[in-house]
Amino acid sequence: MAHKKAGGSSRNGRDSAGQRRGVKRYGGEFVRAGNILVRQLGTKFHPGKNVGLGRDYTLFAMIDGIVAFEYKDKTRQQISVYPIPAQE
């Protein structure tokens, strides 16, 4: 009688999809109003000039302009969007 004992079942073998967090637009890039700049957990980056903060701490541009990463103080980093001066 060629029998084989039942093997145990593995308790591994699962993986969740990533949440696509991180910086979406970098310093010096041109953005349009409403563009998402950063997706984050908590305020790793704080909103600066012309940048809004969403319910889930997403930072987004409130005007068309150029992105700038700055330091509020020694530890806190902020992101601002500055308008492009009008060309004559």
From Swiss-Prot:
Keywords: Ribonucleoprotein, Ribosomal protein
Listed SUPFAM superfamilies: Ribosomal L27 protein-like (SSF110324)
Gene3D superfamilies associated with the record: 2.40.50.100
Keyword Endoplasmic reticulum among record annotations: no
Keyword Transport: no
PANTHER family in UniProt: LARGE RIBOSOMAL SUBUNIT PROTEIN BL27M, RIBOSOMAL PROTEIN L27
Annotated protein name in UniProt: Large ribosomal subunit protein bL27
Organism: Syntrophobacter fumaroxidans (strain DSM 10017 / MPOB)
The gene coding this protein: rpmA
